A protein has these predicted regions:
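Positively charged n-region of N-terminal signal peptides that target proteins for export
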Residues: 1-7
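Sec/Tat signal peptide C-region and signal peptidase I cleavage site
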Residues: 15-19
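Extracellular/periplasmic metallocenter environments
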Residues: 20-26, 42, 46, 61, ...
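N-terminal edge beta-strand
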Residues: 30-60
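Beta-strand signatures of extracellular beta-sandwich domains
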Residues: 73-77
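Short edge-strand/loop segments of extracellular domains
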Residues: 78-84
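Extracellular/luminal beta-rich ligand-recognition
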Residues: 85-108
């Protein structure tokens, strides 16, 4: 279970200061404006590539695949946002929404009616079960690594 907590918290963000912090990171991008594509493979103990460099103004299509056996999240955020999101993810685990290898989508939908944070529907992140793939398009408003 400890491994699950470590891996699920690898890339996290917060919705509390979402709007203000997102201005520093960027915004949802448009497919018609994509300037490059980056494939991200999420394993249980690491992600590939290890680092990603982007420049201000770039619109990047991330093709993200969970190649591990645990649920993983990929998101674009500041370190401060990652730290604030940890308790939200823990709440999702405590409420039975996030299981080690599965997302209980019915419970997520039900719980999101009481707490919108439980919906986990953010344009800067994808939450994937093992073997799932997703795409995220993001326009960066500053240089980032």
């Amino acid at each position: 279970m400890r491994l699950f907590f470590i891996t699920i918290f690898t890339l996290l963000f917060s919705t509390q200061s979402f709007a203000a912090a997102m201005k520093m990171v960027g915004m949802k991008g448009k497919a018609s404006e994509v300037t490059k594509t980056i494939r991200v493979n999420m394993y249980d103990n690491y992600y590939e590539p290890k680092t990603i460099n982007v420049k201000k103004g770039e619109t990047v299509r991330f093709i993200v695949e969970n190649k591990g056996v645990l649920v993983h999240e990929f998101n674009i955020a500041t370190m401060k946002m990652h730290k604030k999101h940890g308790p939200e993810m823990l709440d999702m685990m405590k409420n039975g929404i996030l299981l080690p290898n599965k997302i209980n989508k019915e419970k997520m939908k039900m719980m999101s009616k009481m707490n919108h944070k439980m919906a986990h529907s953010h344009s800067n992140s994808v939450l994937l079960e093992p073997k799932q793939k997703a795409e995220l398009i993001w326009k960066f408003t500053s240089n980032a690594e």
